[in-house]
From Swiss-Prot:
UniProt name for this protein: Histidinol-phosphate aminotransferase
Record gene name: hisC
GO molecular function: histidinol-phosphate transaminase activity; pyridoxal phosphate binding
Keyword Kinase: no
A GO biological-process term: L-histidine biosynthetic process
InterPro entries recorded: Aminotrans_II_pyridoxalP_BS, Aminotransferase_I/II_large, HisP_aminotrans, PyrdxlP-dep_Trfase, PyrdxlP-dep_Trfase_major, PyrdxlP-dep_Trfase_small
Amino acid sequence: MTQHRQTSQPRPVAKPEPNSIQLADLPLRSELVGAQPYGAPQLDVPVRLNVNENPYPPSEAVRKDMAKAVAKAAKSLNRYPDREATGLREDLARYIGFGISSSQIWPANGSNEVMTHILQAFGGPGRSMLTFTPTYSMYPEYARNTHTNYVTRPRNASWGLTTDEILSAIEEVKPDVVLLTTPNNPTGTTIPVAVIDEVCAGTDTIVVVDEAYQEFTDAPEDSSIALLPKYGRLIVVRTLSKAFALAGGRLGYAVAAPAVVDALQMVRLPYHLSDVSQVVARVALAHAPEMLARVDELRETRANLEDWLQLHGLDVVSSQSNFVLFGRFADRHAVFQALLDRGVLIREVGPTGYLRVCAGTPCQTDAFRTALLDVLPTAPRLVPEEDQ
């Protein structure tokens, strides 16, 4: 009689429990104690209008070209990428215009990394950075992470800045870097190029102009990039995350004098920009007219949103970006939460009493309007203007 041996089943191996050490037990740098990681809420809700993304993905034709480019790049992923991102810099120079050469371009993983490189090169211990609030909430993070002293001064009552206001603050603070954001986030207000021209003429400090939303302005060609031949200490920072609908691609860039680019290369990590990032960005730039085709529509959506919000008795900051800052609520969090409960995510950011919403698709914008109309009758009272 044949006996069949029973095969024993492998016993499940118990996974070891993670070490129970607490964050408070780690030898953190003192400025990190009690801090929280930066990040806007990423929630799975029907309508997300909170991080100023372009709501329209790249077209099928663009996606196919990106897939081909990535497949080609994958054949050599065993090799390090082009450290200088030569082709990408040439493509960016062609897109920008203004007679810019590739030696004046510095690309990195989003404008976040570009800004960090700038502060690593020109900020750091014993140095300071000046900017004007309210403004982008990542700026203090850049300063903290590069050990740069972060100094702010307020914007004026119109959320703008004049030449005298900027130069007076520079004279008072004597910063190593001054950061001017136009259009500003979260207000959407701009600083005229003529003002930036006068500021650069009146100071020897490094002047950084953040133009992340420049393509959404009524006159996108009116850029501080035009001033670069005059001022060797001017740096203009841009991104493909917004108008180019490439937030997931993580590609930002600086435009400056070649010597400034040399300085930024000193502090970059080796091979900082992957082959995949480079080829995807190059495809996007090759399709620039198509990638930017929705910008006019989003600009119109933003303008219509401003009118609609004002029509319903809300205070609105006139914007030159793809978002609108509106209020003013006694308890803005209650309004934010009520909208979220209705499946609409916007941003609780900026001056007291205000909320920010970005331009979406027609369906998304309609959903926001419907939800807000439902919330407004029971919303906390508007903050009186004189209390601002």
